[in-house]
Amino acid sequence: MDIKCLNWFESKGENRALFLKARDRNNDSVFIKFEHNYYYVVRESTKNELTIVPKYSKCLGDMNIVNIDERVITNTAVKNYVPENSTLWLIAHPSKLVIKEELMAEFLNITWFFLINNIVPDGCFRLNTDYLTLIRKGCYFCNNPELCFKNPIPRFDVSKTYLYFDIECQFEKKFPSVFTNPVSHISCCYIDKFNKEYKFTIVNKELLSQEELDKAGDILQIDTVNEMDYDADIVLCSEITLLRIVKKLLELSFDYIVTFNGHNFDIKYLSTRLTILTNEYILFKTPDKAEAVRLCVYERNLASHKGAGGMANTTYHVNNNNGTLFFDLYAYIQKTEKLDSYKLDSIAKHAFYCKSVACPDKNGNYMFVGNNSTDAKGKAELFSAVLATGNYITINDHVCKVVRKEIYPSEFKVVLDMKNAFTPITNETYELSFGKDNVSLSDMYKNFTLVTAIEMANYCLHDAVLCKHLWKHYGIETKIDAAAATYILPQCLAFEYRASTLIKGPLLQLLLETKTVLVKSGKQKKLPYEGGRVFAPKKKMFTNNVMIFDYNSLYPNVCIYGNLSPETLVSVVVSSNRLEYDINLKQLKKKFPQPNYILVECEPRSEDLISEVAIFDRQQRGIIPKLLLNFLDKRAKYKKMLKEAENSSDKEIYDSMQYMYKIIANSVYGLMGFRSSVLYSYASAKSCTSIGRSMITYLDSVLNGAKLVDGFLELASNPTNPFFGGFGKKEISTSIDPSITMNFNSVYGDTDSVFLEVDSKDVETTLVVAKELEKIINSIVLFDNFRIEFEAVYKNLIMQSKKKYSTLKIAAGSKNADSAVRINKGTSETRRDVSKFHKCMIKKYKTQLSDTLSAGILTDKQVCVDTLKSLELDLMLEFEMRQSPLEMFLLSRTHHCNYKLNDNPNMALVNKYNSENVEAIEIGERYYFAYVCPETLPWQKKLTNIKTFERIVDKSFTLDGERIFYEIYFKRLATEIVNLLDNKVLSTQLFEKLFGTKPIFYS
């Protein structure tokens, strides 16, 4: 029997069992049951003392037991540490055992199962059916996984089954109550194993009057679940019938059930509503039908991982035991994407967009045509697929209703109602994007007619189908399989854990291969250490081009180069005075000669010390470097396979695999400094950042002041290994046109990147020189496994401060400046706690400054003068005219209760609002507020107690006898703008004039 593994899952009842859900070559589902065991690693003596004979035992052979506790001393009398060598056994038993001296207890039972049986979680196998016993049709018991799964075979594709759904509930207030508000709609997109797609919406007819139902005509109305026709677009039935159909669907063994925030709302709401109305439950059964559990969505609160606003990180999980993988897109995207908003409309707008050409249509409407000539190949095709159920389109921040649409394989024509938006220019190109349909549900429920119900059904179905497109857009299916294979975990757990748990699978595999056991004593003490080096920007505005060079995987390569690992750490020598330090360092260099050892000077761990030197043995590759090399080699392998892949399925899989190895490799450094991690090594973590700082400083010293003259590159200093010495050539021949002359100045650096300003505005020339410079740095300046990559040319760079800048980015693969994209890093444009007015103004002034820099006519002082004059005029004009609406000044924050003080003003503000309003703001909810003061209040130079001017803004809020407290907003805006300018004197003068105080200049 040939199978492809789809998901591994456990039943956690009285008799625990492990199950595999798979497909055979006929695309039929196959379930295999295994005995669930607890795994223990013990010494042979401990095994012999057990009073219970374990169900399974296997000798792991002689293994080195290495104590990785750090040995910190104040002199150079470093003692040689000899690891213990002992014969170890792996034992397994269906019930927990009491073991007095257990080793490797931190690893998961499921990981042991995969490794000892040589099973790849997402693999394809030719099963030996001699070890399978039929339980019931399609379900078997396996009594020997190792022999049954002995023959892996090349991967083959099978089709999967999916259910994407969304619900709407009647409500009067902000949120529906499960006790009083019925479900009005459920829309489903259901794909069976033959790839047939069903799209339908079930509407609660009890919300419609009999008069409205009489208008239903050909719309299917049913009374029982058995009457349901999944080919019908819309079905009318009672709420109980609707919920029972949902129960039937959720109890089916789909491969994936995908929702958007369904774990926290939709699924819980449907389940609870069903129980309230019928006393029935959604039940999941194991494939052997031996265990049934009621659907339950349980919460996992991690107070140790607090999110924005100090709220504990909460995740939601469905307790099913039937092999279906329930997936919440909201939780996944929130964890993996950095977006301004995680509402479905914002995510859809970010994911699905296409450039199109405008032309007039009837009745003042406009048609937009998109195809492979208006945007990149494939964009129109994807947009067309989403457009099939789309009802509204976003264009230039205006949401427009779709009047009609024509969809072709690689082209779309969509007519939009532009009356309340703007008048497009004929034959001009506009970017269309999707967002949430522009409808007011509360208004629709107030006048709930059949027409309204159908309109809402279209809206609901679009959201369900959006889930399908987002699932494909993010390539989640292949990422799940890739994560399962990489982390040696079941598919259903691949995204459940944090990096500290995900690393355990690959680490255990390596430890078994190298016959190594790492042990440490007691709880680890938390100690601080310095991070990466960030250079201060040399100036604010750049008229010349700036080259950006990044180290490839700096920290992983630092660990490999230094052989940083807890078991390769010889010792840490600390000194309390300068004389002691000099003597110790001199003796250490003699005792531990390079390159067999590396001495890493780090910042001291306490104030009573002046130095700390970590000594690492480089003679035999350590566990962490081996782990990293394995990850990087496999990533390179899959990147190569990705380039050679001929079909889209293979490309998606290889791309997901290389991505997973990139993520896990980059997580290792963080885990070395995380004391709860199995890889925790304080000395290794701080040595990693110390070497990293040396590498960025070294690159800066070689490039800052370099010159290109007559085809030769003259470096600023001799390329010298900062750890082991050795000089390289300072003058290097290049293949660059000898007529090109260029000077290089380092103007900023951050951890693993260097910003090099060149005395040229020519983008094409800068690109050519940068690519040649990349080759020279990698072949002559850098050494061993260190490499840099030319990332981009930045044009019209504006540096606000460290880690905050705006620029036009021309990627390394570009040929000229035509592909330039504006980016903002760490600035207010990317933040959620900044008003629209602030964002619009800062965008205006950055564009203005960028244009001025491009022109290159004005001096820095004149740029500053013109900018400050314009700013003062704009602010005073807005203050006098008050033209911008209140919504431009709204701010938002999350309501929570994790404040240190009981009388926190944010809490008091919400409590006051809740006491005066029926619709209370709940814990975890975001609310809008603004700064408001009496209308008669003149311009305020001195701003004090600004928290007292905060007012929560809801739909009913109006400025009655009040005005926006502009001065607060203007001061924040002016602070950011003066930090874009180089002249502190002029900036201070304006600030003192407007606000009676000096500005805060960013460090």
At which residue positions do the language-model features occur?
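Common nucleic-acid-contacting/processivity interface regions adjacent to the catalytic cores
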Residues: 359-389, 397-399, 417, 424-435, ...
